[in-house]
Amino acid sequence: MIISPKIKSENDNFKIFEAVKIAFTKLNSNIKNTKGRPRKYSDEQIVACMLYGVKHSIFSLRELEYEIKKDYVFQTIINLNQIPDYSTFSLRAKTLEKHIYYGIYAMFIELIAPETRLCAIDATALRSSKYDSEAKSGKGTRLGYYRGYKLHCIVTVTDTIIPLVFDLTTANVYDNQVPDLLYEAKIYNPFLILADAAYDSVEWFEIAEKLEFNLLTDINMRKAKSIEAFIDKRYENALFFESPIGVNLYKNRLKIEQLFSVL
């Protein structure tokens, strides 16, 4: 199928595929294998297909295969001579997720250049299919007891709400069991990260101090009758949280909940 240059330039899929190719060129990730048969589909083509699914709200790989088979313009744009089946999408997507997706995402954040001085961290429940053998049971604020996964992320909350770093765990992992996110967020140079009471932990305050940024959390009283029973960093946090400045700053944490509400 031949498509005129004008139609190509006005097609969203063409623009997306061009952006994907630029990203891969910068990452220099699509190195040809010297062993075995050459791949039938390039990494750029697989990523373009996955983005096609996102753009068209396609949540099943079988449906993705079916819809792409009908879209001859898209096939021509990304130079597909044959459509990958759903199992190929699954295998290739898992490989790309480990080695490439995060690099591309970090590149897009760099291009957007959001204000990162004020951020927030939280987690949200993601219910799974009852046939998912890898899912675990846990308790979430929104769903109560459920079976599935949990998305943990740190987002900017100043003007544009953009996830900076994230992790997906099973539902049985507590919110404060992913301290690695703090280390990953360091490259964005945050000044203050806001969090709910689940993160009111000496370990988290010590990590934040080591990384040279601040952590402000809601107060987790546990069995204490007052904040006077707290020691060290937890006491300092409680005082700041109850101060007028702390109250004002903490209001921005609601923005991460707004983000989760649309997931």
Predicted regions and their residues:
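Non-catalytic DNA-binding core/recognition domains of DNA-processing enzymes
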Residues: 45, 67-69, 85
